[in-house]
Amino acid sequence: MEANHMFLRATALVLTLAFAASALASPTGNAAAGKKKAGTCAACHGDGNKTLNDTYPKLAGQYPEYLSKAMHEYKSGKRKNAIMGAQAQTLSEQDIADLSAYFASLKPQIHDLSGHAR
C-alpha cells in the first residue's frame, strides 16, 4: 500500500514538473507583436489569405501550435525548404510565438467551388 502511494506521488510530481517545464519553454504569443514582425512573411504568404503563389500555404486561421511546430521544424532542419529554413534561422522563440499568435488570429477566407471568396 505504501509503495502504491509513493508511486502515485512520484507520478504526480513528474507530471507537474513536465507541465511546468513545457509552460516555461514556450513563450506566450502576442498577436500585435506578431503583426509587426510579419512583414517578411508577407513577401511570400501575402496577408495570410492571399499568397503570391498558390503553392505557398495560407497562414490565416491556422492553429498556433501547428504554426509554431512548423517554424521550429524549419529552424531545426527537420522540415526541408531552403527559403523557410533560412527565414526560420533568424527567429527567436518569442518571434515564433508572436507570429503564430498573429496568423492564428486572422480570419481565414473560405472559397466556394468556383474559387470565389465567401
PLM segments and residue spans:
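Flexible coil segments in periplasmic/lumen-exposed cytochrome c-class electron-transfer proteins
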Residues: 26-38, 47, 79-118
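N-terminal signal peptide c-region/cleavage motif recognized by signal peptidases
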Residues: 20-23
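Bacterial N-terminal signal peptides that target proteins for export
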Residues: 2-12
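Sequence context surrounding c-type heme c attachment/ligation sites in exported
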Residues: 31-42, 51, 60-69
